[in-house]
Amino acid sequence: MKKKFLNKYNSEKKIIDKFFKILNFKKQGTFNFENDAAYLNTYKKNKLVITTDTIIENLDFFENDPPDSIAQKIICVNLSDLSSMGSIPIGYTLNLTINSKIDYIWLKKFTNKLYHLQKKYNFYLLGGDLSKSTDVSLSATFFGKVKSNYILSQDKSSIGDEIWVTGNLGDSYIGYKILNNLNLKLDSKNKKYFINSYLYPKPCMFGYIASKYISSSIDISDGFYGDLKKLLKDNYGAMIHQKKIPISKKLLNLIQNNNFNKTIIDILSWGDDYELIFTANVKYRHKIIKLANLNKIKLTSVGSIIKKTGIYDDSLKT
């Protein structure tokens, strides 16, 4: 099967024509992938936001991970970065390195997931590069747009700002541990839930939706506490109410019903949640909650910015 695939699609152009051309959505600036470069129209009242991420086999994903999961991960990590800056995606470039184990079915599932996500979040593939090596790796550069007055950064919080978190945290960590043979008392349904939380992360685009009310923002890729520290100015700190940090009922049940030697701080410090931590003036509280409800986004106020440096969690400094 793989020999037939390699014989039939024995050049970069043939693979691109078969699997990737559909992803350009026939946008004029892509030149249907016939040129060596593409272009984007600029926007008078918007800033162009650029972010890039790389994921590597045996570091960011496993060899046997489903190809649609790998596609979802490379898209999610970039959309999450854009959202944290108050931006929505326009397009992206993709550099994909494949090896001899990649076949027709793998590429079909991979590009089908890309197509679905592009449709869902309204962006398209501008171009990229395809190469071969011993390990699979992907690097994507995303271009987004944001209104000039609403671009977000990590250093604009003020003392007294509320600290908010979207979604639930920690489920991805449990999924990763299950895939690494952690023995937990879980039925197949709950086990699948946690594994899918790791394999199929979902970006939260609330940064764009609420950008006019947000003072600072970051996505949770390196863990709640690690990323929160990045939001704090040198002379600012945070008071966090740990019991308010949102975790799913499934995770809470797991912690209560298993002999689990990890604390909630350990779980929250792992990362790969791709939710948002953001700060906002308390006067915008009701408007932010209203936007979250309208867009069916879970939102939790977990603390506030304080003058004393450091992160304080239930009166314990971390």
Task: Spell out what each predicted region is.
Residues 1-318:
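Helix-biased detector of long, well-ordered alpha-helical tracts
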